[in-house]
Design a protein with these regions (language model features):
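Structural signal for interior beta-strand "rungs" in well-ordered beta-sheet cores
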Residues: 1-127
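Long, leucine- and charge-enriched amphipathic alpha-helices
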Residues: 132-136
């Protein structure tokens, strides 16, 4: 994982002691990066599919039955619920909670938590109905 702090003279790397846990029936595409956890574990739960070029940062937890399209990036310590679908090239900021059954449109930038069953898109990502209304 990517973990540094500055001591005013130089940058110092702190060790990551967590592990990566990959559940059953998980598919991981080509050129993915999955960082080990810093103080806790990085987890990809059962029946989740990662397309190519997905980055999963330290301490991320991805739930069951998720489908993640190519070039999605998860910043550290974000929790993704079960049955979540994320379109290609979406970016998910760190320390967020994404609820169960959420759908995130491709190219979206998620900078806030998303409640369960919501559908979002855009940057910043917002409810799809609000996005369409504001972008006509």
């Amino acid at each position: 994982g990517f973990g540094f702090f500055s001591n005013n003279k130089n940058n110092v790397r702190y060790p990551h002691i967590g592990i990566v846990i990959i559940g059953n029936n998980v598919e991981i595409g080509c050129n993915n990066i999955i960082d080990r956890g810093s103080m806790s574990n990085t987890i990809i739960d059962n029946n989740t599919y990662l397309d190519n070029q997905v980055h999963v940062a330290h301490n991320v937890k991805i739930g069951k039955n998720c489908i993640i399209a190519g070039q999605v990036g998860f910043a550290g310590s974000t929790t993704i619920g079960n049955n979540v679908m994320i379109g290609g090239q979406a970016g998910i900021s760190g320390h967020l909670n994404i609820g169960d059954n959420v759908k995130i449109g491709g190219g979206s930038g998620v900078i806030d938590d998303i409640s369960k069953n919501d559908k979002v898109m855009g940057y910043p990502a917002k409810n799809i109905k609000k996005f369409i209304k504001n972008n006509q």
